[in-house]
A protein has these predicted regions:
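C-terminal amphipathic/interface module of NAD(P)-dependent oxidoreductases
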Residues: 133-164
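Active-site "gating" loop of Rossmann-like NAD(P)-dependent oxidoreductase/epimerase domains
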Residues: 1-15
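Mid/C-terminal beta-alpha module of Rossmann-like enzyme folds, strongest
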Residues: 80-83, 87-131
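Substrate-positioning beta->alpha
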Residues: 19, 37, 43, 48-53, ...
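A short C-terminal helix-loop "cap" of Rossmann-like NAD(P)-dependent dehydrogenase/epimerase domains
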Residues: 52-64, 121-125
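Conserved beta-loop-beta element that borders a ligand/cofactor-binding pocket
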Residues: 24-46
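Non-catalytic, hydrophobic alpha-helical segments
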Residues: 77, 81, 100, 111, ...
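Conserved catalytic Lys-bearing alpha helix of Rossmann-like short-chain dehydrogenase/reductases
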Residues: 16-28, 74
Length: 164
């Protein structure tokens, strides 16, 4: 539906994997020591991406209905772990949950269109494939993470996919 969500938003996952992740977060909350959960978006990084492979195979996701893509570069994933560990070691409090995504939730079609242009794959040559069944089609907000003092090296998919 494209609505925005953050760590305070209600979570009612329909998929098995989403339900399993929520159950794991509940176990983390029960842990008697300091702990937090990190909800990573779609992780990508160096090397060939699944999206580029899909484009090279002649397929692009449908333009409609728009499916929101929340991504995070693998380098930023590691940096988030280090940031939160340093906060803990410095005696600073941690929130119970962080959304770890970049600052630009974007319709997947736009991401794939940008990647096709970057990789010189003519859009006219692409056929619409199946819609993505992943994720909940929400715009995940990373304000809690940024408010903790973290700064993204790759604030959007454009910086992340350009650094290849």
């Amino acid at each position: 539906d494209g609505s925005s969500v953050d760590e305070y938003s209600a979570t009612v996952p329909a998929s098995f994997s989403g339900q399993t992740m929520l159950a794991a977060e509940a176990l983390v909350e029960e842990y008697p020591g300091p702990a937090c959960s990190i909800r990573f978006g779609g992780i990508y990084g160096r090397g060939k991406s699944r999206l580029v492979s899909r484009l090279e195979a002649g397929e692009i996701c449908p333009h409609e209905p728009a499916v929101i893509s929340n991504r995070i570069h693998s380098v930023d994933c590691c940096r988030i772990f280090m940031h939160l560990l340093r906060r803990y070691q410095a005696g600073q409090s941690l929130d119970s949950i962080y959304l770890a995504v970049d600052s630009q939730p974007t319709p997947l079609y736009e991401v794939m269109q940008w990647l096709a242009n970057k990789n010189r794959i003519p859009l006219a040559s692409l056929k619409q494939g199946a819609a993505s069944a992943r994720g909940g089609n929400k715009r995940c907000l990373n304000q809690r993470l940024l408010s903790s003092g973290f700064s993204l090296q790759y604030p959007s998919f454009k910086e992340g996919f350009s650094d290849r």
